[in-house]
């Protein structure tokens, strides 16, 4: 979700919320809560995308299992566990616990920086999806093993995991800007 996600959510407020804007201090509280909600939705979207990729990995794993090529299954299992770990870390992160949602006034430029960071994560997910799609179907010979493609996907997933862990620092930097 980009800055447009926040603006779209803001535009969908009901009459009671709009009335609350008239109460001193309420608007800042309301905006912080809205940012928390948008952040939560963004994280859920990323976690769901990782779950979708995990399902694709399991489909490919099933193909190798059905073909009796069990030697390749370790690589699939590692990728599956890594996808699950990152998905859970993102889904259950303490949203709103960082300074981005405190009473500090955050400018549009700082928010845009955070949204750009989140967009780059979505771009990385698209790359990971391509890596998983590139894992070959089981072939008749052991030379068709998926190890190289699985390693490439695992490397991209590790980089994505590292990037996600940097998000807290980006959020802190946004507040200090």
Model-predicted regions and their roles:
Residues 8, 12, 30, 42, ...:
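Residue-identity detector for glutamine
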Residues 138-177:
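Preference for long, well-ordered alpha-helical segments
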Residues 1-65:
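Leu/Val/Ala/Ile-rich N-terminal alpha-helices, chiefly Sec-type signal peptides and the beginnings
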């Amino acid at each position: 979700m980009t800055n447009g996600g926040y603006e779209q959510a803001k535009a969908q407020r009901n009459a009671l919320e709009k009335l609350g804007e008239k109460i001193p201090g309420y608007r800042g509280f309301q905006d912080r809560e809205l940012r928390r909600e948008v952040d939560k939705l963004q994280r859920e979207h990323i976690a769901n995308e990782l779950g979708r990729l995990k399902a694709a990995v399991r489909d490919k794993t099933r193909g190798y299992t059905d073909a009796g090529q069990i030697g390749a299954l370790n690589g699939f299992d590692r990728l599956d566990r890594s996808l699950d770990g990152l998905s859970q870390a993102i889904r259950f992160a303490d949203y709103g616990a960082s300074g981005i949602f405190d009473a500090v006034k955050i400018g549009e430029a700082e928010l845009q920086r955070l949204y750009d960071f989140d967009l780059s994560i979505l771009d990385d997910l698209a790359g990971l999806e391509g890596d998983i799609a590139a894992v070959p179907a089981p072939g008749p010979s052991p030379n068709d093993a998926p190890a190289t493609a699985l390693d490439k996907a695992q490397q991209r997933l590790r980089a994505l995991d590292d990037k996600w862990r940097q998000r807290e620092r980006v959020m802190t930097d946004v507040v200090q800007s």
